[in-house]
């Protein structure tokens, strides 16, 4: 057989004939030629035997072959007729033209083929970002090639907006050429390439014309929306980039697919027709996607330009109204002078008095109504279309989640509404003043007797009006006086002024050195005791100082809790850049819609964020703050989970880079050889000591830094294995905890009404009390159920934060020790410095056992305060809503205090036991570890000396002696220290805890507490002693093995060298002899 050559004339003659295709490639459409030959063999012999028959048959064959046959390459062997071929190129597609056909047929994608299903439908287009045009092309080429024998028209997106594929005259003529391919003769192979280039040029010209059409359309945006030139050029440049990238990429993909098909040995004409139609579908799909993407890009932030234009018009109107008002006031002295002359002279020329200019004010009012109703939606309408704050409209069925709305009610929208309200107040005030002045003028005209007094009043009026006009545009008096929560809430924070004002004096002196910012309200600055120019570090430091002072004493009275609550409110506002900007500009009006969290929950999240230099802000803290501050339900959070995950992925990379950079900064002095490099680190850790969950966080950081450093030093296999095992275990546990947390939050915080138990704001105080539906609400549960649920939630949050912290610290440390821009020697120094940092942290961590106990204690402690905050805030809300008299409020406060005392009694035993156990175990462990370390060091030195002399003989004996010495020393020291420490610590801790927490309790309860404490202490001490002994033995064995191995190697090398030298000398002596 000849080798294949796709471009030769011989190939076209050999493989493009119907007869050859029938013989070599029979299909289901061809007849069985052999059977027909056998049946008609005798009949052919009879015909051929007669004269004149053969020439007649030959002529008929030529005629019929020219009219009915075709010169194609179809592997099916079926003649190309309308009955059994595809009609893909008609201008209108029939519903089902082959429904009554008995023969096998090949149809288009409208009817589908067996086992061929589209990857998506028009109702659910592919989830690809509108700026990712290359990703769209890749997805489209996969979908459009879904069918093997037909084309997938459903892959064309956005057909409801930009129309499907329409076959115009140019495409219709081209499809006719493809249908008639081979009928006119010639080289079909070359014709295929020519026609492919032709359809590519047709579609590229259409695509280029689309670019001109879009540019012409969007160039009108500059005039229509007064879009800045820079913004327009930036958006259009992005569109041009998408158009060029998409066109080049699609052309390359289509040409590549055609060339791969064109190089095959057997070319199917039907497959070629499918490829030409695929070309048309592909360019149409890309055109639709480009139009959609450009529309999204050009329409983004279009509301901002509308807002700017609206504010400009409002500002112009306000200035115009003010100018008219000033002219009117300037004309008042002339009017008064003319009235005095008329009154004195008994009448005068009335026509000399100029008419009052009331028309501009009326037109301003009409324009205000028209523009507010027609041009810009109200604040309520904006919130109705919001995609984030739609919790209040979902239940009413008003929310429409459609891409055309683009109605995220952002911070910019809120600022715009506040700014607009300011100008509206200015216009309303100017109109009211003009009306009042007109009324006063009429009363002056009527009251002739009080002429002089009236004149005096009118002379003084303009100055007062000027002052009012100057003050009102900042913030209207109505908005300043009304929203003050209640006189209790505003005045009570001043109780903390004794604690606030004294330390604030130094702070304010430094902050007031800069130019003072003029703000309408400084209440929150006064609560934190900082100046209005204070930076974020100063505000944060001051918040933690005040919060840690008030936190332990919340239950002692309503005043302390109120101070703690106000401190948290102040930091929620001033600690956030956007809220601080609103507060500085608009005062109380700017934060009326801010949703404040339960103070203890906010303190919990802030405490987890306190270690952000080493860990960054944990992801769960960021998500929960967004969750609570926006008052989103769990259903809302699930709807926005994809966008949040994308944001958190990007944030995680920045977070790891920040931690890695911070580690490098604090370790650089150690790398450089500074002996005092650890002083600032110890100061930093001392400042973090005592925070909520400080021990678990430091223990996680210590463990990660230690083993990551070891993986980059000698004997890294064990640490690498431990890291891998811990990472896998964390992933499994994290998945389970995430599911548990989500299910718990969904059950108790699944709706906006359920969120009212832990959030509140100043504008909708009443709505925070009612719970219209029958869903579970934390505030409605019993004390035991509340405690159980909240302990679960807090425990889940802390566990997720710890796993997140470990993962972040691991990645940041790996980045630090895998820097390609640094040599190996420097990387080794970094690893050694990181290991030293973990040793410093170990002093503050306290070990794994203290880690768990401290976490459980902090969890129970903070849950108690959360419950106290929920009950207190709900009581205040109900009292304000029902206008309860003062004596009822007093009784409510007494009830709250009584409940707090009961809670203290309930938790007192746990606190006493916990403190006693911690102190006893801590002292016992310190003494055991200290004595064990001294003994181990002495014994190891003895072991090393003995090993140098006789390695093989003395190793076993020394190890046994070490173990015996360690056990004896440990037992002796532990028994002595434990007895002394138990007696001292138990007596001290029991007396202190009993005096502080159980002064009001009965003597019987105190005795029970003491007995329980002694029993628990004895049990825990015995367990801890055994565990310490086991740990010491393990450490001794590891140290001995390491030292033994090193010494053995050294001794072996020395012995080998001495032995070799002696043998050489003996050999030389023998040789000389």
Swiss-Prot record:
<keyword id="KW-0472">Membrane</keyword>
<feature type="glycosylation site" description="N-linked (GlcNAc...) asparagine">
    <location>
        <position position="639"/>
    </location>
</feature>
<feature type="glycosylation site" description="N-linked (GlcNAc...) asparagine">
    <location>
        <position position="777"/>
    </location>
</feature>
<dbReference type="InterPro" id="IPR052423">
    <property type="entry name" value="EMIR"/>
</dbReference>
<keyword id="KW-0732">Signal</keyword>
<keyword id="KW-0325">Glycoprotein</keyword>
<feature type="region of interest" description="Disordered">
    <location>
        <begin position="428"/>
        <end position="514"/>
    </location>
</feature>
<feature type="signal peptide">
    <location>
        <begin position="1"/>
        <end position="65"/>
    </location>
</feature>
<dbReference type="Pfam" id="PF14308">
    <property type="entry name" value="DnaJ-X"/>
</dbReference>
<dbReference type="InterPro" id="IPR036869">
    <property type="entry name" value="J_dom_sf"/>
</dbReference>
<keyword id="KW-1003">Cell membrane</keyword>
<feature type="region of interest" description="Tandem repeats 2">
    <location>
        <begin position="891"/>
        <end position="1073"/>
    </location>
</feature>
<comment type="function">
    <text>May disrupt the normal intermolecular interactions of the cytoplasmic domain of band 3 and thereby facilitate the invagination of the red cell membrane which is necessary for the formation of the parasitophorous vacuole.</text>
</comment>
<keyword id="KW-0461">Malaria</keyword>
<dbReference type="InterPro" id="IPR001623">
    <property type="entry name" value="DnaJ_domain"/>
</dbReference>
<dbReference type="InterPro" id="IPR044885">
    <property type="entry name" value="PRESA_N_sf"/>
</dbReference>
<feature type="compositionally biased region" description="Acidic residues">
    <location>
        <begin position="428"/>
        <end position="444"/>
    </location>
</feature>
<feature type="compositionally biased region" description="Acidic residues">
    <location>
        <begin position="457"/>
        <end position="470"/>
    </location>
</feature>
<feature type="compositionally biased region" description="Basic and acidic residues">
    <location>
        <begin position="445"/>
        <end position="456"/>
    </location>
</feature>
<feature type="compositionally biased region" description="Basic and acidic residues">
    <location>
        <begin position="476"/>
        <end position="502"/>
    </location>
</feature>
<feature type="glycosylation site" description="N-linked (GlcNAc...) asparagine">
    <location>
        <position position="773"/>
    </location>
</feature>
<feature type="compositionally biased region" description="Basic and acidic residues">
    <location>
        <begin position="894"/>
        <end position="930"/>
    </location>
</feature>
<dbReference type="GO" id="GO:0005886">
    <property type="term" value="C:plasma membrane"/>
</dbReference>
<keyword id="KW-0677">Repeat</keyword>
<protein>
    <recommendedName>
        <fullName>Ring-infected erythrocyte surface antigen</fullName>
    </recommendedName>
</protein>
<dbReference type="InterPro" id="IPR019111">
    <property type="entry name" value="PRESA_N"/>
</dbReference>
<dbReference type="InterPro" id="IPR018253">
    <property type="entry name" value="DnaJ_domain_CS"/>
</dbReference>
<feature type="glycosylation site" description="N-linked (GlcNAc...) asparagine">
    <location>
        <position position="71"/>
    </location>
</feature>
<dbReference type="Pfam" id="PF09687">
    <property type="entry name" value="PRESAN"/>
</dbReference>
<feature type="domain" description="J">
    <location>
        <begin position="521"/>
        <end position="589"/>
    </location>
</feature>
<feature type="region of interest" description="Tandem repeats 1">
    <location>
        <begin position="436"/>
        <end position="504"/>
    </location>
</feature>
<feature type="compositionally biased region" description="Acidic residues">
    <location>
        <begin position="931"/>
        <end position="1073"/>
    </location>
</feature>
<feature type="region of interest" description="Disordered">
    <location>
        <begin position="894"/>
        <end position="1073"/>
    </location>
</feature>
<dbReference type="InterPro" id="IPR026894">
    <property type="entry name" value="DnaJ_X"/>
</dbReference>
<dbReference type="Pfam" id="PF00226">
    <property type="entry name" value="DnaJ"/>
</dbReference>
